[in-house]
């Protein structure tokens, strides 16, 4: 495979429901959508000589928020492409921006990921992944989550019913919300809403047990075994693995109603990205000492 670096201009559609994806009063482009864009570009351009299975990605980072303006309909972006070998390719989604005085134009990367042209067998889930724990559980109603803890609009209310939190992890029923019918990449990686909802669960868990509003900043590996489908329900297990230098690490397992593993994320990294300006409400820490 050619090891040269390629930069491809992109015009990305901004669908109306993206306006419900907000952080600190600003609308931000969803990270799961950025991954769909990158996977779709690989599929369109046929970078691999073998069949491309887009559901295997690693070393993924959500570098900077891509802020959207109210009513914005498109994003003029760049995709930086760097083939690694015959089975791996690294891509990043970036935009141009001007310095404050307008004298210079620079590139800002928003998402980077390495995609693999290979598949892996579905692992056997251990009991901790399949069954809820027997330790005390703190339950959080969905309306409280999206009103006070993860204040996204209705289009991104992926957690159904109530979220169950224990020291050993978060347990959620998720709804794959509808994608825009005009989205050409809507089936590329399956629905992005279940993973987005799992990140919401990790954010709430972080608020309860660590007192920090943690948002995803990347992951080590994500494998999609069975693409999720819009309008369907799924179950997420968000399992804490480590805490270091302000970053919380999780593994995420998303299963369907039959108990089949749909996707697994290892080394999901979450941290406070507000600089300490956003803090959890007191009630979510009730009983934590």
Region locations from a protein language model:
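Acyl-thioester-processing domains in fatty-acid/polyketide/NRPS systems
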Residues: 1-289
């Amino acid at each position: 495979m050619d090891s040269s670096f390629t930069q491809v201009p992109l015009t990305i559609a901004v669908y109306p429901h993206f306006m419900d994806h907000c952080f600190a009063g600003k609308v931000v482009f969803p990270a799961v959508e950025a991954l769909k864009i990158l996977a779709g570009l690989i599929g369109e351009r046929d970078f691999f000589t073998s069949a491309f299975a887009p559901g295997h990605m690693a070393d993924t980072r959500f570098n900077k928020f891509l802020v959207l303006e109210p009513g914005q309909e498109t994003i003029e972006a760049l995709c930086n492409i760097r083939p690694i070998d015959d089975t791996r390719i690294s891509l990043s989604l970036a935009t141009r921006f001007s310095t404050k005085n307008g004298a210079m134009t620079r590139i800002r990367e928003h998402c980077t990921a390495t995609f693999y042209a290979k598949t892996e067998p579905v692992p056997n889930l251990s009991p901790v992944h399949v069954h809820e724990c027997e330790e005390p559980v703190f339950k959080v109603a969905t309306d409280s989550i999206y009103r006070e803890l993860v204040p996204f609009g209705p289009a991104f209310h992926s957690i159904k019913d109530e979220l169950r939190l224990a020291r050993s992890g978060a347990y959620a029923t998720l709804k794959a919300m509808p994608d825009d019918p005009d989205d050409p990449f809507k089936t590329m990686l399956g629905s992005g809403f279940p993973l987005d909802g799992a990140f919401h669960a990790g954010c709430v868990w972080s608020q309860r047990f660590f007192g920090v509003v943690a948002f995803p900043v990347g992951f080590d590996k994500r494998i999609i075994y069975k693409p999720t489908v819009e309008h369907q329900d799924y179950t997420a297990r968000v399992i804490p693995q480590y805490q270091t230098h302000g970053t919380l690490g999780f593994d995420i397992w998303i299963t369907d109603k039959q108990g089949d593993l749909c996707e697994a994320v290892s080394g999901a990294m979450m941290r406070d990205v507000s600089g300490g300006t956003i803090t959890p409400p007191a009630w979510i820490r009730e009983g934590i000492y």
